[in-house]
């Protein structure tokens, strides 16, 4: 079977995602029914993390165990990567000892170089540029609650970060619209915006205008990992971009709210929104587990048929 990697959302087509979501539904149901499903017995996942993580690490580690395999966590601080070993050399060695790898790092170029030299599938557990596993779970969560996302409108409020970038790629795959509203100076990079065009992406100055008639409102922390030195400046710059009840009222009545977590109540979102009836953030977080189990199954076994 040809080795496939999952480094960006555009690495798979819509048909493949529909298959993954079908598998996710079945795998999640088996999990809820406490039925054992071990298709990855004797397979090993290596998780190489340069950045801190709660949900990504836990969902991959628990997911691999629940599929019958085992998982090994490697921090770059504890390996030779942290002492300057070339990424290419690390990929060649590690991929001879395990069956699949999740890499969470800063520069997206690092994971591309790693994948080019790996003998096994590599999954992007987050880079500064993309977070495809998060959007995989987000779209599945939307489908659970509202059906197909095709033709819908997603409003992204806040920093145009890696999650925002991935939403833009997903809009191309699933044919939905993304409204982005950021403070001046934090807009989607012009060269990146040019990749998507106005059919699926539109930039708004006012967050309330961006949210108008949206089916899904989503945001993230104002200060992503690696930008801690800018925290005070960002709090001032993003002060008008907090998702509150007034902003949610501009969206459709049945609109959902998502946040990839961790959240800072009173900053990017008010407590009454994230803890309110429109919020599906806890389903969203749980679905990281189920979608990534389907992803690992697909990368290691290919299509096995929907049960």
From Swiss-Prot:
The lineage of its organism: Bacteria, Pseudomonadati, Pseudomonadota, Betaproteobacteria, Nitrosomonadales. Its main location: cytoplasm. This is Ornithine carbamoyltransferase. It catalyses: carbamoyl phosphate + L-ornithine = L-citrulline + phosphate + H(+). NCBIfam families: orni_carb_tr (TIGR00658), PRK00779.1 (NF001986). GO terms for cellular component: cytoplasm. It is found in: Cytoplasm. Reversibly catalyzes the transfer of the carbamoyl group from carbamoyl phosphate (CP) to the N(epsilon) atom of ornithine (ORN) to produce L-citrulline. SUPFAM superfamilies: Aspartate/ornithine carbamoyltransferase. Pfam families: OTCace, OTCace_N. It is an enzyme of class 2 (transferase). It comes from Nitrosomonas europaea (strain ATCC 19718 / CIP 103999 / KCTC 2705 / NBRC 14298). Keywords: Amino-acid biosynthesis, Arginine biosynthesis, Cytoplasm, Transferase. Belongs to the aspartate/ornithine carbamoyltransferase superfamily. OTCase family.
């Amino acid at each position: 079977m040809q080795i496939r990697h999952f480094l960006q959302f555009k690495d798979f087509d819509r048909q493949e995602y529909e298959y993954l979501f079908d598998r996710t539904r079945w795998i999640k149901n088996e999990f809820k029914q406490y039925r054992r499903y071990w298709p990855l017995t004797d397979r090993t996942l290596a998780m190489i993390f340069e950045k801190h993580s709660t949900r990504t690490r836990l969902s991959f580690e628990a997911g691999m165990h629940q599929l019958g395999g085992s998982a090994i966590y490697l921090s770059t601080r504890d390996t030779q990567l942290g002492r300057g070993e070339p990424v290419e050399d690390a990929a060649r060695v590690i991929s001879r000892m395990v069956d699949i790898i999740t890499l969470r790092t800063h520069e997206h170029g690092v994971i591309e170089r790693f994948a080019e030299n790996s003998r096994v599938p590599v999954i992007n557990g987050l880079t500064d540029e993309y977070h495809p596993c998060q959007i995989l779970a987000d779209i599945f969560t939307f489908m659970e609650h509202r059906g197909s996302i095709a033709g819908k409108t997603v409003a992204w409020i806040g920093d145009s970060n890696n999650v925002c970038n991935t939403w833009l790629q997903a809009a191309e795959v699933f044919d939905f619209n993304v409204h982005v509203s950021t403070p001046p100076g934090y807009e989607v990079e012009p060269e990146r915006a040019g990749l998507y065009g106005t059919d699926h992406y539109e930039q708004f100055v006012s967050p309330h205008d961006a949210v108008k008639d949206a089916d899904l409102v989503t945001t993230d922390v104002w200060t992503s990992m690696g930008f801690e030195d800018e925290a005070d400046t960002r709090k001032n710059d993003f002060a008008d971009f907090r998702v509150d009840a007034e902003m949610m009222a501009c969206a459709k009545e049945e609109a959902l709210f998502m946040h990839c977590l961790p959240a800072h109540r009173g900053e990017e979102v008010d407590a009454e929104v994230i803890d309110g009836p429109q919020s599906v953030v806890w389903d969203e977080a749980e679905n990281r587990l189920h979608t990534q189990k389907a992803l690992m199954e697909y990368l290691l076994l290919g299509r096995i048929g929907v049960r």
